[in-house]
Amino acid sequence: MIEITQPAQEAIKAAIEGAGQPVAGLRLMVQAGGCAGLKYGMALELEAQPDDASLTFGEVTVLIDPLTREHIEGTKIDFVSNLEGAGFTFDNPNAKSACGCGKSFC
């Protein structure tokens, strides 16, 4: 379904450990918005929803709702650090186009 690189897994694990409370995992979302029409979102989830896909990558659980699954099939998620800062990147083969920031697509 999706690929999460080792650096991304480590960043997610650090966020979960820093949450201060138990979480079910990291939710990946695709929402309307951004400069290209759709945008990626991520949030720590206290509990999974019944229709979520629950994927495990190492020590990290990722939750994905059915609508998001349609948009991110085959996506590679990475975490990069460079002179411009640090953050997650999404390489989505389903995106027809993307904006320069890499956070939204259509």
From Swiss-Prot:
Recorded coiled-coil stretches: none
One of the protein's GO biological processes: iron-sulfur cluster assembly
Entry-linked Gene3D superfamilies: HesB-like domain (2.60.300.12)
Molecular function GO terms recorded: 2 iron, 2 sulfur cluster binding; 4 iron, 4 sulfur cluster binding; iron ion binding
Family: Belongs to the HesB/IscA family.
PANTHER family from the UniProt entry: IRON-SULFUR CLUSTER ASSEMBLY 2 HOMOLOG, MITOCHONDRIAL
NCBIfam families: iron-sulfur cluster assembly accessory protein (TIGR00049)
Full protein name: Uncharacterized protein in nifU 5'region
